[in-house]
Amino acid sequence: MKTYLFSIPTKKTDETSWVKPLNNYLLSIYGNTTEYQSDLEKFDKLRQDIRGVNPDNTGIKLYYNYYSQLELLDLRFPFSTVNRHKKVNFSWYDAFQPSVVHKQTALAFEKACVLFNLGALLSTYAGAKYEEAQRNSSIAAADETIKESLQIFQQTAGIYQFLNENFLHAPSNDLHQASVKFLVKLMLAQAQEVFVLKVISGDLEQNKNSLIAKLCQGTTNHYTECFNMVCNINKSGGGSSHDDFAVTDTNESVDDILGDDDDDDDLGDYNPEKSGEPQVTASIDSAWVATIHFKVQFYESLSHYFHGLQLEKNNKYGDSIAYLTKSQNILNEISSATLKAISKSGSNDSYELLDNYKYQKDAVGIKLTEMNKDNDFIYHDIIPSLITLPEIKPMDGVKTIPINNSKLFNDLNEYNYSNFFNNVVPINIHELLSFYSEEKSQFLRNELDLVDVSNEESASILEYLKMPKSLVNLKEIMNSSKHVDTMSTSSETNIDPGVRSIVNEVSSKYQTDMSNKDHISTIRKEIYNTITESESNLSGKFSESLIKYKDDLVRLKKSLIDASNSDNNLFGLINNDNSHLYAILGKGADSPEFKMLFNVDSQTSKKQSNNVENEISLLDIDDSQLSSSVNATDSIDSKIKSIEDILHDLNSIKNNKAKLVDTLKKEIHNDDISDILILNSKIKSTNEIKTVIFPEELKKFDPYGKELDNLIEQEKTFINELKNQWANLSDDPKVKEIQSSKQFQSNLIKHQTDKIIKFYNQNWKKYSLGLSAGVDFYNKLLAYARSLKQNIATAVNAPPQSSFNENFSNLNLGPQHSGPRAPPRPNQSYRPSYGDQSGTPQYNASHFSSNSPSLNHNLPPQYSQSSLHRSSTGGSFASHHSNESPGSYSRPPPALPPKRPSYSAQPTPHAPPQAPYTQFQPQASNYTDNSSSSANPTNLPQHPDSGTNDLIYNQPSTYQPNMYNFFSSN
């Protein structure tokens, strides 16, 4: 059985250019449209291509693609802004009245027309598939094609359903809501019809009569709804001028086609005012109305016919005859005008309907005659009244398929979203994304705060319990208690590596320091002997030329005394309190003596020897005591293992939290809902997006929050268990006993370490450096003493001078000086720092004044003119000569008292120079550099070159014989 299917006509359109309006908008926003030119050209070409497509896969794909890009254009471009400067005009012609054109600048009008044409193409394509199935000789291929046709009809209904729900104010009759709704019902009716015919043609054994009856009744209902919406079309015979739907006799009205009221009493059932259906405003062809009316009656007749066949199978012959009679009556009610209108529709398939009508009318008549005959002669079943027959329940086998469920449309949407103006994002979407980013950040901050608080709580508890250090120490103690022989070894391993390096440094210089100390004592004794011999040579000699050597000897001796005092303080750094420690450290870190410092056994040997008598003999210990000790140790080990497992679990939880937080950060960073916001920006307000979409999108992160909460709860459980088990372990008597011995060992190691470090910093470093500096100092002092001794011997053996006046006249004030060098002073490196030890002489090379050139002659660089000034404190000496040339040894004349008149006529002997150290007062305080009191003395005699008019030799003499008895003792 074959039927006639309607194909919706397409709307024609005029050419429209998209390039310039969109390019102007992009130029005003982005300033450069180079990257968008390709999309603009393709989009404009696609608009031109849809004007002449065929109803096939290619044409349908072009329309799907164009509509998809229109939707994206509406989402990415504010069309009101695009139309502000250069308006885009859309011209579309009415599908049922091609002469009527409608022009709009609204993008919604363009989308509605495109959807209408897409549905029209699909309806034509579905009809073509149905025709293909009828021509196909292969049953399997025909069935597959029929299924495809059914699918397309339902998709067409879905497209018109979407158009009906989203475009409410249509400017044309064909886009009016009633017209579009009529097309939805028509496509569903045709899909149901194709499905019914497929079931009928496949049920050769008539096993599905009941199902077919219900499906036919459903088809009747669909066409009834369609007819109710078009039965009021202009009864003057006006119809569409479209060629496919032209009616040959245009003078026939709908009343003529459907029959007079007398011939068709059922027209009252189709009163549109009673049905409540909206009336179609489009100019539907009258042939459509006639065909729809015919199908209403034809499928209602089929429904009663197949229901009667089913009753016959159930041996209900009376009821079967009644339904067959009703089926025959419905067929007879089809007016001749309706059949005439169908025959004049100009379509070849319309004749199939007339053939089906004739065939079904004959089949019902033959079957009804047979049933009446059998019932009259055999069954004698009562035939019920036709009015009392129950209604047949309808069944729908089809439904609308939404446009969003179309695989082709979804694929094109996905492709276009990533390739069609994908970089164009409206400003309002950027603002919404900023709000959403803040929501995500707040969610992340809340989770991070929970993690940080849990980590801090866990860390504080572990710190309070001193975990895991306390557990590690306890394990070491337990292992040490099991292996007593390794106690000393474990003590050695606990020694600070810094202490070992200190000990190695002390031991490496130990022999050198001892040698330097002995060398200092030897040289000091030799210097003293040299001074003694020099003094012996000068004893009893009062020559004026020897006075300067006596001064040098005094300074040399004073330097030796000061250096000796400094040596005593230096040697005092190693005293009876630390000499034993110094001797042990001098043997190195690997020596047994050093290791014994940290050995607990050696430190407690006395205590143990005193308590030997209190120890229990091994012979007195029975097996039960040994067994209880072993069991206690095993119990402690198991508790330690349990605590270790808890610590491992806590660490794993912490790592899992960190990993989960990192994953959450990445997910939040990569989360992009711009697509969702763009797609919903047209159908939801900003407030709805914030209050509905944002919370819904944030739910995707809830699993991370729940997982973090679970980890935190597990962490709290483990921490409570850890506290309980650690308290239980700490209260164990065996653990307390072992911890006390370990504490003694730790205290011993700390005490010895502090003692060694203190000795190293406060004693040995100063001691070693002082010895090295002292050796250098005494070597130079010895060289000076030997030189001075030789010069004295030469001067003593020299012939005496003639007279005082001759000596005075021959006094050499030039730069040459042949006398011995001044004794060196202890330099800076040989002046050890003793902290607050007052009264200790300290030596510094800077105490020698640069104003004493006689002391600087031939001295090493460190005792040159810039460093040989000696302060007036601590009994030190300084020379107060000024303005002398380097290398000379010229002394100013002493400030003699005025001459007395009684001695004016007598010759006065030459007075020896004044001793330089008479200007200073020795003190017991520290020897410090006091340049203010020694560098510029105020009452010193002036150099002879400083002013000849002020020389004392031109003044009256006040010489007294006993005023220079200072040297009489020498």
Swiss-Prot record:
Residues 827-845, 862-880, 920-957 have a biased composition (Polar residues). InterPro entries: ALIX_V_dom, BRO1_dom, BRO1_sf. Residues 254-279, 803-957 are annotated as: Disordered. Residues 254-268 have a biased composition (Acidic residues). Residues 891-900 have a biased composition (Pro residues). GO terms for cellular component: endosome. One of its GO terms (biological process) is protein transport to vacuole involved in ubiquitin-dependent protein catabolic process via the multivesicular body sorting pathway. Transmembrane segments: none annotated. Residues 4-458 form the BRO1 domain. Pfam families: ALIX_LYPXL_bnd, BRO1. Keywords: Cytoplasm, Endosome, Protein transport, Transport. CDD domains: BRO1_ScBro1_like, V_ScBro1_like. Belongs to the BRO1 family. This is Vacuolar protein-sorting protein BRO1. It comes from Debaryomyces hansenii (strain ATCC 36239 / CBS 767 / BCRC 21394 / JCM 1990 / NBRC 0083 / IGC 2968). The lineage of its organism: Eukaryota, Fungi, Dikarya, Ascomycota, Saccharomycotina.
